[in-house]
């Protein structure tokens, strides 16, 4: 019984490094299971008095070892989740970076097109502008044939006023009106 207590104290004093090796946890769990099975199958008369107490200790040891293993798996799962989130974030950043690069290339391409169009159409525009201004100066004494013809706007309030006046309706009788 003293060796069991010493083993329990040693296992509690030497915490298992969960970061390094899960095999240690599996080995410890396996040893404790073997110890429990050996104890249960052993038929020693001297130990029959303490059977309940020893079984409780063995089961407690087994539960502690399984809890340590469970904690290890939980820590691994949280690490995996954190790594997964980092990878997803990196993928999203990469995707946005590619979109920006594509848009920058598109902007550069259209910027070059605008320059090309400007070099092509600017001389035409300047020559047409020069012709237009020289023609307008030559025709300053004559009525400008390029000026727009003035079209009077209808008097909108008087039209609305005429439409809103009451008029007799032949179908409704002499005194009726339609607005």
Curated annotation (Swiss-Prot):
Pfam families: Med28
GO cellular component terms listed in the entry, alphabetical order: mediator complex
Alphabetically ordered keywords of this record: Activator, Coiled coil, Nucleus, Transcription, Transcription regulation
GO molecular function terms listed in the Swiss-Prot or TrEMBL record: transcription coregulator activity
Recorded superkingdom: Eukaryota
Localisation: Nucleus
Positions in coiled-coil regions: 81-119
InterPro entries in alphabetical order: Mediator_Med28
GO term, biological process aspect, one: transcription by RNA polymerase II
The keyword Transcription regulation is assigned to this record: yes
Claim: Nucleotidyltransferase is one of the keywords in the record: no
Subunit composition and interactions: Component of the Mediator complex.
Family, as annotated: Belongs to the Mediator complex subunit 28 family.
Protein purpose: Component of the Mediator complex, a coactivator involved in the regulated transcription of nearly all RNA polymerase II-dependent genes. Mediator functions as a bridge to convey information from gene-specific regulatory proteins to the basal RNA polymerase II transcription machinery. Mediator is recruited to promoters by direct interactions with regulatory proteins and serves as a scaffold for the assembly of a functional preinitiation complex with RNA polymerase II and the general transcription factors.
Protein name, UniProt field: Putative mediator of RNA polymerase II transcription subunit 28
Organism listed in the record: Dictyostelium discoideum
Gene that encodes it: med28
């Amino acid at each position: 019984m003293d060796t069991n207590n010493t083993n329990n104290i040693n296992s509690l004093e030497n915490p298992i490094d969960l970061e390094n090796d899960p095999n240690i946890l599996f080995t410890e769990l396996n040893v404790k299971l073997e110890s429990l099975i050996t104890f249960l199958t052993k038929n020693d008369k001297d130990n029959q008095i303490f059977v309940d107490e020893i079984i409780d200790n063995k089961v407690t040891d087994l539960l502690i070892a399984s809890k340590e293993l469970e904690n290890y798996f939980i820590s691994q799962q949280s690490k995996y989740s954190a790594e997964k989130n980092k990878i997803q974030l990196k993928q999203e950043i990469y995707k946005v970076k590619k979109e920006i690069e594509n848009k920058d290339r598109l902007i550069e391409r259209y910027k070059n097109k605008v320059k090309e169009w400007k070099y092509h159409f600017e001389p035409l525009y300047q020559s047409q502008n020069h012709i237009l201004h020289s023609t307008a100066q030559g025709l300053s004494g004559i009525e400008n044939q390029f000026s727009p013809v003035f079209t009077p706007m209808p008097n909108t309030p008087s039209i609305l006023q005429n439409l809103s006046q009451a008029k007799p309706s032949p179908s409704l009788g002499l005194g009726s009106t339609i607005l």
